UniProtKB/Swiss-Prot annotation:
Site entry: Cleavage: L310, T311
Native source organism of the sequence: Rattus norvegicus
bZIP domain ranges (all copies): 189-252
Keywords on record: Activator, DNA-binding, Endoplasmic reticulum, Glycoprotein, Membrane, Nucleus, Signal-anchor, Transcription, Transcription regulation, Transmembrane, Transmembrane helix, Unfolded protein response
Name used for this protein in its record: Cyclic AMP-responsive element-binding protein 3-like protein 4
Lineage of the organism: Eukaryota, Metazoa, Chordata, Craniata, Vertebrata
Length: 367
C-alpha cells in the first residue's frame, strides 16, 4: 500500500458509531466505555481526525497488532509527536470470546503520549491526534492471554489421600507431599498402596460372596434335613399303617376261608336233604299208579302161610328152650312157587320179665 492512498485519507464515518460498538461486543454507546468520562466521550466523538496521521503498514513479527503484550511497559516516545489514543479491535476474536467469557474490554487499548510507527493491517485501525486529557486506560487483548501450563495447574492441585492410604503409607514409612506433582518413586509407591487396597477390597468381596454362598448352602441343608426328618416320620407312620392293614387282611382271609367252608358244608347238607326228599316224594308220583287195572290183571295176590307160637305168661322157662332155639336156627330153605328160593327168616323175641318168665315167638314167612 502507498501512503497517499485515497481510501486511507478519508476516515471511516462509522468507526465510532453505535453499530460499530455493537460489533465490537459493547451493548452501550461509546460514552459507556471505561476510562472515559462523559465530557471526554463528547470530545472524543466530535474530534477532528487528520487523515494524514493515519498510515497503514504490516504488523511487526513479534506482536499480533503492533501493541506490546505488556500493557504496563511504555513505548519510546517521539519528541515532536502529540498525545494519541490507540484503539485496536478485532471483530472475529471478540465475537468468539464474547460467548465464553461474557462482555470484556480487553480489545481496546488506549495509550497517552505514545507514538510508534503503526501499520495498517486487515482487521485493525489506529486513530491518532487525540486529546491528552483523556485518562490513560490500557487493557490487554484476549488473544494475548495464554492458558497456564499443565505443570502450573498441577502445582495448584492438592493430593487427597484416604485414611486407609495414609495408614498403609505410615506402615511403609513413606510420607507423600500434600500437593502435586509427585516424583516417579512417589507415584510408584502410591500406585502400589492403591493396588494393595484394591486387592484387599476384592479379597473382602470374594470372602463375603463365599460366606453368603456357604450360608445359603447351610440354610438349604438345614431345610432339607428338616424336610427329610418329616418324611422319615411320615414313612414310619405309613409303615405302621401298612402293618395294621396287612394284619387286617390276614384276618379277613381267615374269616372268608371259614365262612366259605361253612357255606360249602351247609350247601352240601341242603343238597343231600333235597335229594332224599326227592327220592321219597317221587315214587308216589310214579306213572304206574295211574293204571291200577293193568296192575291187577298182570299181578295176583297170593296168601301167606304163617305160624305163630304162643306162650303163656305164667309159663315157666322150660328146659327144652335151648334145644328149640337150635332147631329153629337150623330150619331148611323152602323152595318158592316161582322157582326162586328164599331164606326163611325166623325171629325170636325173648323178653325177660322181672318175674322170670320168657316169651318166645318164632315167625316164619314164606313167599
Amino acid at each position: 500500500m502507498e501512503l497517499g492512498c485515497p481510501e486511507l485519507l478519508e476516515p471511516p464515518e462509522d468507526i465510532f458509531s453505535t453499530g460499530s460498538f455493537l460489533e465490537l461486543g459493547f451493548n452501550g454507546p461509546p460514552s459507556k466505555v471505561p476510562g472515559l468520562q462523559k465530557s471526554e466521550s463528547d470530545d472524543f466523538l466530535n474530534l477532528f481526525i487528520d487523515p494524514n496521521m493515519i498510515r497503514c503498514s504490516e504488523t511487526s513479527p513479534g506482536s499480533d497488532s503492533g501493541v506490546s503484550e505488556d500493557p504496563g511497559s511504555p513505548a519510546p516516545q517521539a519528541p515532536s509527536s502529540p498525545a494519541l489514543y490507540e484503539v485496536v479491535y478485532e471483530a472475529g476474536a471478540l465475537q468468539g470470546t464474547q460467548r465464553e467469557a461474557g462482555p470484556t474490554f480487553g480489545l481496546i487499548s488506549i495509550q497517552i503520549d505514545q507514538w510508534s510507527p503503526a501499520f495498517m493491517v486487515p482487521g485493525a485501525c489506529t486513530v491518532s491526534d487525540l486529546p491528552s486529557e483523556a485518562h490513560r486506560h490500557i487493557l490487554p487483548r484476549v488473544s494475548t492471554i495464554a492458558p497456564p501450563p499443565p505443570a502450573a495447574l498441577l502445582s495448584c492441585q492438592r493430593l487427597f489421600l484416604t485414611d486407609e492410604e495414609k495408614h498403609l503409607l505410615g506402615q511403609e514409612g513413606v510420607t507423600l507431599p500434600s500437593h502435586l506433582p509427585l516424583t516417579k518413586a512417589e507415584e510408584r509407591i502410591l500406585k502400589k498402596i492403591r493396588r494393595k487396597i484394591r486387592n484387599k477390597q476384592s479379597a473382602q468381596d470374594s470372602r463375603r460372596r463365599k460366606k453368603e454362598y456357604i450360608d445359603g448352602l447351610e440354610s438349604r441343608v438345614a431345610a432339607c434335613s428338616e424336610q427329610n426328618q418329616k418324611l422319615q416320620r411320615k414313612v414310619q407312620e405309613l409303615e405302621r399303617q401298612n402293618i395294621s392293614l396287612v394284619a387286617q387282611v390276614h384276618q379277613l382271609q381267615k374269616f372268608t376261608a371259614q365262612t366259605s367252608s361253612r357255606a360249602a358244608q351247609t350247601s352240601t347238607c341242603v343238597l343231600i336233604l333235597l335229594f332224599s326228599l326227592a327220592l321219597i316224594i317221587l315214587p308216589s308220583f310214579s306213572p304206574f299208579q295211574s293204571q291200577p287195572e293193568a296192575r291187577s290183571e298182570g299181578y295176583q295176590l297170593h296168601g301167606v302161610i304163617s305160624r305163630n307160637i304162643l306162650t303163656h305168661e305164667d309159663m315157666t322157662e322150660s328146659p327144652e328152650s335151648p334145644v328149640l332155639k337150635a332147631n329153629l336156627e337150623e330150619l331148611p330153605q323152602v323152595p318158592a312157587t316161582n322157582g326162586s328160593t328164599k331164606m326163611a327168616h325166623l325171629k325170636m323175641r325173648v323178653k325177660a320179665r322181672p318175674t322170670g318168665p320168657i316169651r318166645g315167638m318164632v315167625h316164619a314167612d314164606e313167599m
